[in-house]
Amino acid sequence: MLAKSVRRAAFGLLAGVSLSFAAADVADAGQMRLGMTTWVGYGPMFLARDKGFFKENGLEVELQIIEDAALYMAAVAAGKLDGNASTIDEIMKYRSEDFCFKAIVALDDSHGGDGVLVRDEVNSLKDLKGQQVGMNLGSVSQFWFNILLKKEGMTEADLNITNMTADDAAAAFIAGQIPAAVTWEPHLSLVRTKKQGKVLIDSSQTPGLIVDVVDLTCDYIKNNPKDVEAFVKGLYKAVDFIKTNQDEAYAIMAKGVGGYLENPADFAEAAKGVRFYDQARNIEFFGSAEKGEAADLIKLGDEIWGSFEKMKMKVDYNSIVDLSFVSPK
């Protein structure tokens, strides 16, 4: 995924974050302040904001770009933000007895945007045993790759893992410096085009594993249930709008998200690697605490990040998900 090295790599809360937010145009409207990195999957929130889908439900939403997970999580902990958008495995690492927040809706999943680059002679992960693999440790890349290894009966101990950003890993692979890399677009397409190796596996083969969610503090959810419902309604309307007005939607989202995605053509290309979640997909994904994709994913997150001592507490479905708003009234 483009630029996730700043999007999903950091871990640990940082103190003393100072953020400024514009005043709301409507004084009596509900308020919600969210932090996130620059990412195509967050486009529907900007679309809902700029098309007025949040406002028509009585909600003003501030979307603040902060290119570091630790910084926006620190801002949430300090009360400067009400929540954030991130992968569900990422936010699990910050959940503690003293820092309560829960996912209220899912935004998207990686659907081909992440992958493993290898040389042409490699046909399985087992062929990489003992070899060097470039990967961003502590990021969603490590989480996803460990799921792949688990399916093959392998662990990182079977490989020689080198910690580097996803962009650096791709560059090192293309330069012939390492035999394998865990990275994302546009590097996957570049390797396919130049035929400098191949993509052994990408996230289109593992749907529902790299999932972005919006999480809000437990206090915000408790004190502002109507605003949370308004947010989810506006988000769903934006996702439905994309289905029928793609060109207009991509132009609005590109401008809103900005950064490396400010060109609508670049945004459209990046969007090929994600799947936006509408209401039906949210209901399917979250399932229940007893059964469903989210429950399984959270168990994997607790297991994998726990094995690397990244967790502050044992996290289960009920401690990280609030299902109350997935089907708004």
Predicted regions and their residues:
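Pocket-lining segment of extracytoplasmic ligand-binding domains
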Residues: 89-90, 161-162, 168-262
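Short, glycine-/small- and polar/acidic-enriched structural segments
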Residues: 26-163, 179-186, 201, 208
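Hinge/cleft segment of the Venus flytrap/periplasmic-binding protein
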Residues: 301-329
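Buried hydrophobic packing residues in well-ordered domains
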Residues: 76, 128, 145, 173, ...
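Secondary-structure end/capping motifs
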Residues: 222-310
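Soluble non-cytosolic domains of exported or imported proteins
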Residues: 39, 66-70, 85, 135, ...
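Bacterial N-terminal signal peptides that target proteins for export
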Residues: 1-13
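C-terminal segment of classical bacterial N-terminal signal peptides
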Residues: 17-25
